[in-house]
Amino acid sequence: TFGVATLGFRYKNFKAEGSVFTGREPDENRYDFDKARFDSYSYRLSFNPTENWVLQFSQGFINSPEALEPDEDVKRTTASVLYSKKINMDKHFSGAAIWGLNDKGVDHKEHSFLLEGNYQFMKNAIYSRYEYIQKSKEELDLDNGFPGERFNVHAFTAGYNRQLISFNNIDLNVGTQLTVNGVDKDLQNLYGKTPVSFQVYLQLRPSLHKH
């Protein structure tokens, strides 16, 4: 978005932040600057009970984010729990549970949920992820006569990657992952019952900071 101003406050293990920003998503002309309207706002609260845990809650009140639906505002709510543990110099585990809700009114509320974990050992990592999301008929570009208003989509991913080289605090990794999807029964004629995807990838990322 174009135009964001944020103010934060920290006290011991608590942190509070507030932001004002432009609710409308950028237009199709990606090479210019849209007008900053500062017509939306959000707040976020977080708490670190220990050095390993982070608890977070946030809400955003977004004014007319979609150009095709200019009269619809969105209240977005999120909550998350993050965990990170350094087991020893060569082993590290991290995990996350994240929930979100887009609320456009009584008949248009869409939930999402993410649960993932990553275990890093030496130059190797194994990870898994579960994703759940609700999609509306409009987002899936379905006809008005299509049965149902919201549709549940699930995805289960398992993967492995290995560091090939590291230079200037940047790691180059190679990895592979498999994803199995669970599709709402009303969508199975379009997408199948359990679509499966397989991926091999190269990844550039910052090196893990070591104390």
Please provide the spans of the model-predicted regions.
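Outer-membrane beta-barrel "beta-signal"
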Residues: A158, G192-H211
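Outer-membrane beta-barrel translocator/channel fold
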Residues: Q59-L68, E72, K91-S112, A125-G159, ...
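Loop-centered beta-sheet repeat module
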Residues: F14-E66
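Outer-membrane beta-barrel and related beta-rich outer-membrane complex signature
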Residues: R30, E69, L140-L142, D186-L190
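Residues that define the transmembrane beta-barrel architecture of outer-membrane proteins
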Residues: T1-A5, R10-K12, R37-Y41, D73-T77, ...
